[in-house]
Amino acid sequence: MYMIESKGGAIACMLLALLFLGTWPAIMTLTERRGRLPQHTYLDYTLTNLLAAVIIALTLGEIGPSRPNFFTQLSQDNWQSVMFAMAGGIVLSLGNLATQYAWAYVGLSVTEVITASITVVIGTTLNYFLDDRINRAEVLFPGVACFLIAVCFGSAVHKSNAADNKTKLQNFKSLETTSSFEMETISASNGLTKGKAKEGTAAFLIELEKQRAIKVFGKSTIIGLVITFFAGICFSLFSPAFNLATNDQWHTLKHGVPKLNVYTAFFYFSISAFVVALILNIRFLYWPILGLPRSSFKAYLNDWNGRGWSFLAGFLCGFGNGLQFMGGQAAGYAAADAVQALPLVSTFWGILLFGEYRRSSRKTYTLLISMLLMFIVAVAVLMASSGHRK
């Protein structure tokens, strides 16, 4: 198998993982905003997410002089470590599934900020102690502090932007009570031209609500925040579980049995994530949640609208997780949690693709820039804390 042995190689893995893991949520959000049911999107996503793990295992897990290889470990008595890997896959799958609904309620940027902050506070601390403190604490924990400051800015951005949107929509009493003639008149005065609303206007927000799969107007953001915090707790546990699977800090393996390599662990990790996602999403097809329309497995198979984007999201997430674990195995999983600065990438895509924060107030822009700058500092500091596993 191929092993990352240099600090530079580990950091390169983390940076690439950061790009991939910050991009796939934007793609999933794009399909939902275009009206595709999240159950359909997630079923497609989970197929290629598993395929990415298989590709990594059959290539990087088999090449190179390091032993044992992927196929060798499949027959070894290492079920204890396999259970840790599969537990990590289960909580990650639950977290990813939850965030798919949270994005609609509280937005892509804020969802990623909150879940990332919980992951850093809980997950990075657990990984630091599990890794026998190979990361430099005097650098690592100031990085965590920078992350928390960025989270505070992120919360302020959400509050300020929500106030901006409320101001934009103040001429609209409700979608249900506004006549079609009034809607056309008001929309025209708020940026709707030739059937296409300008990003950041009240007309744009209304047009988006009509088109998207998950309807959010008139619903409390508390629902979204609860889902988001649940996802954050799940995300904070999957990396420590994977850490235990590959390094056996609790000495659960029998004497002489090799520890799981990162590729074998990632394979089992992805298998459990796939099974959980498959079971839950097939259930959600027939018994949907949050007011979504009912679907069926036949309808899913016939729904090709956005399928390519969903497949791409699965590949990006799968390869992103694999790169994160490869970097973590080499430089410490606490340092690899620097990929939780993925809101940097998600916010970029949110602004570029979805017009988030367009036509917002100067206060919102100031807070947004402050959040992004603090995230940049946080990811740099966490990567600087990288150690080297002996």
From Swiss-Prot:
Gene Ontology biological process terms in this record: allantoin transport; pyrimidine nucleobase salvage; uracil transport
| Tissue spec | Expressed in leaves, flowers, roots and stems.
Q: What induces it?
A: By nitrogen deficiency.
Q: Where in the cell is it found?
A: Membrane
Does the UniProt entry include the keyword Protein biosynthesis? Answer: no
Q: Does the keyword Transcription regulation apply?
A: no
Query: Where is the chain membrane-spanning?
Result: 10-30, 45-65, 79-99, 102-122, 137-157, 222-242, 262-282, 308-328, 334-354, 364-384
What are the record keywords, sorted? ATP-binding, Membrane, Nucleotide-binding, Transmembrane, Transmembrane helix, Transport
What is the topology of this protein in the membrane according to its UniProt annotation? Multi-pass membrane protein
* InterPro entries on file: UPS_plant (IPR030189), Ureide_permease (IPR009834)
Entry-linked Pfam families: Ureide_permease
Primary site of residence:
membrane
| GO molecular function list | allantoin:proton symporter activity; ATP binding; uracil transmembrane transporter activity
Question: Which ranges of this chain reside in the Extracellular compartment per its record?
Answer: 1-9, 66-78, 123-136, 243-261, 329-333, 385-390
- pH behavior: Optimum pH is 4.75.
GO annotations of cellular component type: membrane
- So where does ATP get bound? 213-220
Cytoplasmic topological domain residue ranges: 31-44, 100-101, 158-221, 283-307, 355-363
Annotated function: Proton-coupled transporter that transports a wide spectrum of oxo derivatives of heterocyclic nitrogen compounds, including allantoin, uric acid and xanthine, but not adenine. Mediates high affinity transport of uracil and 5-fluorouracil (a toxic uracil analog). Mediates transport of free pyrimidines and may function during early seedling development in salvage pathways, by the utilization of pyrimidines from seed storage tissue.
The UniProt entry's sequence similarity note says: Belongs to the plant ureide permease (TC 2.A.7.19) family.
Q: What is this protein called?
A: Ureide permease 1
